[in-house]
Regions:
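C-terminal anion-handling pockets and recognition modules
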Residues: 11-15, 146-203
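Short, surface-exposed basic-aromatic patches at helix termini and helix-loop junctions that form
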Residues: 123-129
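Short, basic/hydrophobic alpha-helical segments
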Residues: 88-107
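Short beta-strand segments
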Residues: 16-18, 106-112, 135-137, 190
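RNase H-like polynucleotidyl transferase catalytic core
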Residues: 40-47, 129-148
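Acidic, metal-coordinating catalytic cores used for nucleic-acid/nucleotide bond scission
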Residues: 24, 108-122, 138-143
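Extended, low-complexity cationic-aromatic segments
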Residues: 1-92, 193-202
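Generic structural signal for small/hydrophobic residues in well-ordered secondary structure
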Residues: 19, 56-58, 95, 111, ...
């Protein structure tokens, strides 16, 4: 991370921490309220293999508002041979969208997922002169602020009785959009990496 900070400063670039997460129709369980003496029951539809995958970036640059940029992908809706999760081309599209939105070079920090290290991904990275990549140490989620964003997302989806992949995708997007507008949350995610929350000079 320290090396990425130096490169970002030299290139007037954004530091973007990347990661992926997923949510199925079976929600995480959490404490809830019920009348005294009544056991609360959350009715869910956990059949099938529907899954909403999310790939996201928490983006940092001194003097600018912190950003959360994401893409979602829904799988398991009965289409034969449908890939699950994000592949190299999906990551490239996310990075291209972030570059257009941020209008500056990007220093990407992510983990050693096989799709991040593949020959195809390396070629896609090499084709983008505005992109520099740094890999996080193994088993170090505490260094990636977007892990906290995923934790918050999963807490907000706890006990959610989504019945279809489409309704689950809508719920995931709604919660991520709320998070995007609460920049103080994103700033809080960044502090654990040693980055000081930026005092925005411009939007």
């Amino acid at each position: 991370v320290a090396g990425g900070k130096r490169v970002a400063a030299r290139r007037a670039a954004w530091i973007c921490f990347a990661d992926e997460c997923g949510q199925t129709l079976k929600p995480h369980k959490a404490a809830t309220w019920a009348p005294r003496g009544v056991t609360p029951i959350a009715h869910v539809t956990a059949t099938g293999n529907a899954r909403v995958s999310v790939a996201g970036l928490v983006c940092y640059r001194p003097g600018h508002r912190s950003r959360l940029i994401y893409r979602t992908k829904t799988s398991g809706r009965g289409r034969k041979g449908e890939p699950k999760g994000f592949r190299e081309r999906d990551f490239a599209r996310l990075l291209d969208a972030a570059h257009r939105q941020l209008q500056a070079p990007i220093v990407l920090v992510w983990d050693g997922l096989s799709a991040h290290r593949s020959a195809r991904m390396r070629a896609l990275i090499a084709a983008r002169s505005w992109l520099r990549v740094y890999r996080l140490p193994a088993y170090a989620p505490e260094l990636n602020p977007i892990e906290q964003a995923w934790s918050g997302l999963k807490r907000s989806l706890a006990n959610l009785p989504a019945r279809t992949a489409s309704s689950l995708a809508i719920a995931v997007k709604n919660r991520l959009k709320r998070m995007q507008h609460r920049t103080h949350l994103i700033d809080g995610y960044l502090t654990g990496t040693g980055l000081s929350p930026p005092a925005p000079a411009r939007p």
